[in-house]
Amino acid sequence: MAKTLYEKVWDSHIVAAPEGEAPLIYVDRHLVHEVTSPQAFSGLKVAGRKLRAPEKTFATMDHNTSTKSASLDALSPMARTQVETLAQNCKEFGVRLYDIHHKNQGIVHVMGPELGITLPGTVIVCGDSHTATHGAFGALAFGIGTSEVEHVMATQTLRQLKAKTMKIEVRGLVADGITAKDIVLAIIGKIGMDGGTGYVVEFCGEAIAALSMEGRMTVCNMAIEMGAKAGMIAPDQTTIDYLEGREFAPKGEAWQQAVAAWKALKSDEDAMFDAHVVLEASDIAPQLTWGTNPGQVVAIDQCVPNPEDETNPTVKASIEKALDYVALTPGTQMTDVSINKVFIGSCTNSRIEDLRSAAQQAKGRKVAAGVTAIVVPGSGLVKEQAEAEGLDKIFIDAGFEWRLPGCSMCLAMNDDRLEAGDRCASTSNRNFEGRQGRGSRTHLVSPAMAAAAAIAGHFVDIRKPY
């Protein structure tokens, strides 16, 4: 029977499937951070249990860390308690930890792939909603809740219902200047923020195959923003080239065996999907969100939508509510929307390719008066490489702040947050009300679009001179 990529990975990880119950699947990698792990570790202690597979558990500090200082003194009391608790738990249970002083510390969904922890055909979980990022390697990766974190710690397994399958095909190649962020925002704009609910999505097509691993991670990262359980891209030579030599990737004969298996890991030609969505790559322009969810998105050469043009009363009410919050007028050209904050970072867009793209816009220019812009590399390794290439100097000379790795302004959980009324061009993944700070307004864009907005003081079409 023909199978999809998802079905192949799923079937190979079933431990038990009792009739009438959710199957029990095996977990190959468990990624842990300071926010969703304390209660899980506590649960193990109360029950007197050990960690089932410490060698398959990897921890980092990212959500509540400071991007201004690596000192514990720079943290709030709550944040300090969280990172110190994680350190103690990792020591007690024998978990490998990349703490704030480790050169490989970073956002969990950045450092995992770059260390080779993420491998094709594996099942990866983390107490974080953007775990789907790792699906870019042909892994089945999804976020779990704290009680599930404890279950995986104790058993290295998880009960899960099998999802439906959706194929999202982006035909042809995108035009120059169009990035992975534009592709995935265009997809979400087409199917909506709940269009993928109940599905595991496989992204494919010429435009997807042409992406680097960094670009593929951006696409899969935002699968959750279309409601999907996970996003996956079949591994190919680009995947293999990226993984070769990484710290936790197989070595020697094991590498050759792995590569042979990975090359065969793809959906069968006659595999049936429950849903199929097609986009033409040539139709995709630079994208940016205007509202309060990632599905409220338009192209840069379009206007703020008018709710009066919407016939569906529910959608109309949603548009009206969003416009009221973001304080935009229907019919306004998106290029006329001014910003006063810029955030380049997050698990969506903080990798070396993203920083190069932003630096290309910033080079030889200056951040506009009244705009504060920060650049937060996704990991210590990304920061090191960017500095070796001189990207930090380009940003600093242009007036951007160059920070330490961390989740930063993606969410209002640490000290990097917006004030009420701030309008931010952000390379993150969510533009919900208050996501970056109470009363703040977020517009999701690519790194190049964010950097260009910082220079111009408003959104611009990077395909044209500005």
Curated annotation (Swiss-Prot):
Function: Catalyzes the isomerization between 2-isopropylmalate and 3-isopropylmalate, via the formation of 2-isopropylmaleate.
Name the record gives this protein: 3-isopropylmalate dehydratase large subunit
Subunit architecture: Heterodimer of LeuC and LeuD.
Organism listed in the record: Shewanella loihica (strain ATCC BAA-1088 / PV-4)
Cofactor note (record): Binds 1 [4Fe-4S] cluster per subunit.
Matches recorded under InterPro entries: 3-IsopropMal_deHydase_lsu, Acnase/IPM_dHydase_lsu_aba_1/3, Acoase/IPM_deHydtase_lsu_aba, Aconitase_4Fe-4S_BS, Aconitase_4Fe-4S_dom, IPM_dehydratase_rel_enz, IPMI_cat
Signal peptide coordinates: none
Enzyme class: lyase
MF GO annotations: 3-isopropylmalate dehydratase activity; 4 iron, 4 sulfur cluster binding; metal ion binding
Organism domain of life: Bacteria
Family recorded in the similarity comment: Belongs to the aconitase/IPM isomerase family. LeuC type 1 subfamily.
Primary gene name: leuC
Residues binding [4Fe-4S] cluster: C347, C407, C410
